[in-house]
Structures are given as structure tokens and as C-alpha cells.
């Protein structure tokens, strides 16, 4: 990273090459996905005695509801390592202050927050009209296996969220606020807006950049029925 940062100021340096910048960021993303999966599996197996691949997130497995609390924090760690850390690696490689590179120090007018809230609220009625109906959704002949895979992914996600929200205790509520709301919001903001949007903006027009980033953002959630609502929001 120091070597890359040291050459960033040159006319042909890394900072002046959006493609090199994109490759570094995506390499960090893929690398941290692997590191995250290996690390959380090791932590999980050490804490529970079995591999996380055998864990049923909905708690339906024998004696597995007792591990929901651990699973909650494992999810938070995975999100942080998968999105926030790659963003910081990219920002460090770009050179200069990584916090400034990720727009931590950018001043935003209070009116911009208000405008954003109004825009999102106004879009909700439209978003509801493009939500896929899971019950009536069919891909047609020849695509039954893909349809089955999509439904299984949706059911798994629903079961996981349901299990995480079942515990109504104060500690579980606070944990969910951190793991389900705060960590994803910050980590994904750093990766998609701090790294991806910033980098793609150097390759294409701003409007196209926003659409491409939104597409990738929604795709990486691997929830097909909510793909278009998430992308438009």
C-alpha cells in the first residue's frame, strides 16, 4: 500500500488510473470476502463446536436457537470485514487521508438531508408497485431450478431475519440496531458511495454511475424479489 501510495502522485500513477483504482478496490473486496468467511467460520466453530455451514439461521435445528446471539454478531463482523475494510484498503492505496478520501470530512447542508428524506418518502408508493409478488412469481418452463434456488435464498434470508428479531429483550433490540441497521448502513455506505461511486464516476457520467452502482448494490444483496425496489431506492 505504501508503494502504491508513493507512486500515486506521478502522472501515470495509480491515482490517475480509474481502472487500476477499481481493480484494487475489487481485489480488496474479494480478498476480504475470503478472509471474512475463513475467520467467522473459525470463530463460530470455536464457540459452538460445529461449522457455521451446518447452522440453520431460522433456529429450527436441534439446540440451535441458543446460538442466535452469536450468529447476530457474526453477521455484523462479516458485513464490516466485507464492505468497510475493503473501502479503507482502497482509500489507503489511493493515497492521502483515507477518511477524507471516503468523504468523512465532507460538509453536507442540513437541507440536503431533508431533501433526501422527502425524496425517499415520496418514492415509497412507486417502490411498492415494482415489488415482486413471491407467491405468483414464476420463471416459466426450463427455469424451474433457477426459480427454486431464488425461492430458497429468499426463504433463508426471511428465516434469518425472523430469528434475529424474535428475541424482544432490550439487549437483543440494541444488538439488532447495531448489527442490522448501523453496521450495514455505515459499511455499505463506505464501500458503495466512498469507493465504488467515486471510482466509477471517473469512468462514466454521473447519472450512469449512480445507476450502475445501484444495480451492483442491489445485486450483491442476493434477494431477487426486492432487487428493483432496492435499486431504485
Located regions from the model:
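Transmembrane helix-loop junction
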Residues: 91-92, 132, 198, 202
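N-terminal, membrane-interfacial amphipathic/helix-forming hydrophobic leader that caps
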Residues: 1-113, 117-122, 128
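Alpha-helical transmembrane segments of multi-pass integral membrane proteins
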Residues: 2-21, 38-41, 129-155, 220-233
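Short, functional N-terminal and low-complexity linear motifs
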Residues: 8, 67-70, 96-101, 161-167, ...
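Transmembrane helix-loop-helix hairpins at the membrane interface
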Residues: 123-126, 163-233
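Short amphipathic alpha-helical segments, especially helix-boundary/capping motifs
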Residues: 61-64, 75-77, 105-108, 156-157, ...
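Juxtamembrane helix-loop-helix connectors linking adjacent transmembrane helices
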Residues: 52-58, 100-183
Amino acid at each position: 500500500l505504501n508503494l502504491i501510495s508513493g507512486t500515486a502522485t506521478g502522472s501515470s500513477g495509480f491515482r490517475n488510473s480509474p481502472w487500476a483504482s477499481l481493480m484494487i478496490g475489487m481485489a480488496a473486496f474479494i480478498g476480504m470476502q475470503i478472509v471474512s468467511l475463513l475467520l467467522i467460520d473459525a470463530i463460530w466453530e470455536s464457540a459452538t463446536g460445529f461449522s457455521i455451514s451446518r447452522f440453520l439461521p431460522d433456529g429450527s435445528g436441534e439446540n440451535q436457537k441458543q446460538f442466535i446471539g452469536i450468529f447476530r454478531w457474526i453477521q455484523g463482523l462479516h458485513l464490516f470485514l466485507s464492505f468497510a475494510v475493503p473501502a479503507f484498503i482502497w482509500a489507503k492505496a489511493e493515497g492521502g487521508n483515507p477518511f477524507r478520501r471516503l468523504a468523512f470530512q465532507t460538509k453536507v447542508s442540513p437541507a440536503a438531508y431533508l431533501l433526501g428524506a422527502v425524496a425517499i418518502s415520496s418514492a415509497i408508493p412507486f417502490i411498492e408497485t415494482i415489488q415482486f409478488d413471491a407467491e405468483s412469481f414464476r420463471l416459466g418452463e426450463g427455469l424451474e431450478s433457477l426459480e427454486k434456488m431464488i425461492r430458497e435464498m429468499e426463504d433463508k434470508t426471511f428465516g434469518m431475519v425472523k430469528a434475529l428479531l424474535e428475541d424482544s429483550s432490550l439487549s437483543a433490540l440494541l444488538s439488532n440496531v447495531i448489527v442490522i441497521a448501523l453496521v450495514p448502513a455505515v459499511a455499505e455506505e463506505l464501500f458503495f458511495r466512498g469507493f465504488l461511486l467515486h471510482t466509477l464516476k471517473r469512468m462514466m457520467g454521473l447519472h450512469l454511475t449512480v445507476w450502475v452502482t445501484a444495480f451492483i448494490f442491489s445485486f450483491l444483496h442476493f434477494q431477487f424479489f426486492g432487487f428493483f425496489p432496492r435499486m431504485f431506492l
